[in-house]
Amino acid sequence: MLPVAGSDVTVWSPQGRIHQIEYAMEAVKQGSATVGLKSKTHAVLVALKRAQSELAAHQKKILYVDNHIGISIAGLTADARLLCNFMRQECLDSRFVFDRPLPVSRLVSLIGSKTQIPTQRYGRRPYGVGLLIAGYDDMGPHIFQTCPSANYFDCKAMSIGARSQSARNYLERHMTEFTDCNLNELVKHGLRALRETLPAEQDLTTKNVSIGIVGKDMEFTIYDDDDVAPFLEGLEERPQRKPALPADEPAEKAEEPMEH
């Protein structure tokens, strides 16, 4: 009996699709949102941390790979941990064998080759995680996106995870400003984009935000908990939906649009 399309990664559907890969792409959309963006001198990752319950600590969303590279994840954390270990090993090999840091584009190419294997072999499943890779090398700062389909993209700015379309809308509106931003302004743009993914009643705090920065003369550094506070202090308050006024009281201003 022939296997049903969608039950196995080696079986094509009549429409020319591989459903198992598409299901893995959906796993990325279930993960908490993360944002990556770059200027002429720096690349920044900003991620939203989730806690599985009130008794659990917040999960790490930004991982250190090498002095010049870090990643943020959306999707299955276990798969991300495996890929991160692979990336660390490749960076170490480059330093021991060639005595130089591994170029970011080369590392992303290796990740693409590794994640392509389970999309083609029987008995394997695609990695259910998407990565945003921030790095700095001789070519300048980089932001790359990788997908469970083994595709990867060089980006000026990108967001993946749950409700990430709202963040991408913000990034598209302000993309022309990123190139000449100083580091603090670049981080603020990342935080504003990440805040767009939150429900109206929530806001960014030192507990649910993680920031990773790499750039010229700056090794990859992760900021968590209290270290995030200086970046959040300079961020304006999130505009809230105004409560409806009683019928006998006229509205003072109707200039600002309501939040959608």
UniProtKB/Swiss-Prot annotation:
The record's region (Disordered) falls at: 231-260
Task: Supply the alphabetized keyword list.
Answer: Cytoplasm, Nucleus, Proteasome
A GO cellular component annotation here is:
proteasome core complex
Which compartments does it reside in? Answer: Cytoplasm; Nucleus
Locations of Basic and acidic residues compositional bias? 250-260
Q: Which InterPro entries match?
A: Ntn_hydrolases_N, Proteasome_alpha, Proteasome_alpha-type, Proteasome_alpha1, Proteasome_asu_N, Proteasome_sua/b
Q: Which SMART domains match?
A: Proteasome_A_N
Which Gene Ontology biological process is one annotated for this entry? proteasome-mediated ubiquitin-dependent protein catabolic process
Annotated family = Belongs to the peptidase T1A family.
Among PANTHER family, the record links this protein to: PROTEASOME SUBUNIT ALPHA/BETA
Q: What does this protein do?
A: Component of the 20S core proteasome complex involved in the proteolytic degradation of most intracellular proteins. This complex plays numerous essential roles within the cell by associating with different regulatory particles. Associated with two 19S regulatory particles, forms the 26S proteasome and thus participates in the ATP-dependent degradation of ubiquitinated proteins.
Q: How does it assemble?
A: The 26S proteasome consists of a 20S proteasome core and two 19S regulatory subunits. The 20S proteasome core is a barrel-shaped complex made of 28 subunits that are arranged in four stacked rings. The two outer rings are each formed by seven alpha subunits, and the two inner rings are formed by seven beta subunits. The proteolytic activity is exerted by three beta-subunits PSMB5, PSMB6 and PSMB7.
What name appears for this protein in its UniProt entry? Proteasome subunit alpha type-1
Organism, by scientific name, is: Gallus gallus (Chicken)
Record lineage = Eukaryota, Metazoa, Chordata, Craniata, Vertebrata
Q: Per UniProt, what is the name of the gene that codes for the protein in this document?
A: PSMA1
